[in-house]
Amino acid sequence: MNDTVAGVIAKALARHGVEIIFGQSNPSALMLAAEDIGIRQILFRTENAGGVMADGYSRITNKISVIAVQNGPAATLAVAPMAEAIKASIPMLVLVQDVPTHARDRNGFQEFDHLALFASVSKWTRTIDDPARVDDYVDLAMMVANGGRPGPVVLLLPKNVLDLEAHPAKLPRTANLGSFPLDRPRPCAQAVAKAAGLIAMARAPVVIAGGGVHVSGAVQALVRLSDRAHLPVATTNMGKGAIDETAALSLGVVANITGRSGPAFYTRDLIADADVVLLIGNRTNENGTEGWSLTKPDAIYIHIDIDPCEIGRNYEAVRLLGDARAALDDLTIALEGLDLASRAAARPALEARIA
């Protein structure tokens, strides 16, 4: 006998490395099927709390988190943590029990337009209503959530469809797509060479690292680049921790705390003096740039990001489109072939100024 749709979803989640689901026992058919194969449920009291739990789990494990919620009012409570996750580039799979297909568009119990509800906080929202395509949709959800710039996705699960017999896949699937970054694309070699040349020739270059450094797992790559090219590193609030804040070349957290009464006021001049600014996984948002006033308008910008729409959004830049860790590794290698004597000579005075 074939599995039910709920059973196939549970097995697909397990194949992608899912070990826990944050939930409240809904959808019941799915939660029972998941329990049967060893996927644990971690309970939450409210969906907004469950979403925060899921977000934290993803950040710690570099695996997609899964949260299951009921339709309607319960689903609305998942919006706030999803909004945080999509801005912070954190993958999350939200499974929403929906009204049965025969009740759709008939004012079924707690029926809600979930496509409209999640439009601004989900990378991708789909309904599983074809028992022959369950694996397709679970795999697509994983690819969209963990691929490119990670973020939340939603699968809507009509209650009656979960109990239907699912058609077996024609070929067994073995791919595990449940961790991120799913891929590590590298930037164009010519752009990397150009960026390396600009850094080598710069009078006062600076790095401003954003949250993308953490998402990419690029902390060590950033440390290597900073040490090799003698680059001072500041971070945004989301990038905090990307470099040891007691390190000799660390400028700490900057952005909206560099005002006259802010704790980072005394690093402001170092940022403002930069002639080359390397942005890494940095959305250059208002808070992260103190209203786009932190750096000189005529500075040269180099921007590493996985999202092509973020590069050049606020500052025209040399485009290093790709995974942050891969890009930093390539940039460090490119710099090894260049003369960095002037950067090395300037380092003692720079460290003294930072101290």
Locate the predicted segments by residue.
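Phosphate/pyrophosphate-binding active-site segments
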Residues: 1-4, 132, 298-355
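Short glycine-rich anion-binding loops that position phosphate/pyrophosphate groups of nucleotides
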Residues: 26-28, 70-74, 98-99, 159-161, ...
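Structural signature of the thiamine diphosphate
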Residues: 2, 19-20, 59-96, 119-172, ...
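Glycine-rich oxoanion-binding loops at beta->alpha junctions
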Residues: 37-68, 124-126, 248-270
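Cofactor-pocket helix-loop regions in the catalytic cores of large enzyme subunits
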Residues: 1-27, 31, 132-133, 156-248, ...
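Glycine-rich, anion-gripping cofactor-binding loops and their flanking helix/strand elements
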Residues: 59, 211-302
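Active-site-proximal loop->helix
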Residues: 56, 99-120, 245-250, 315
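Active-site nucleophile and cofactor-binding loops and adjacent substrate-binding regions
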Residues: 24-26, 42-52, 67-74, 129-131, ...
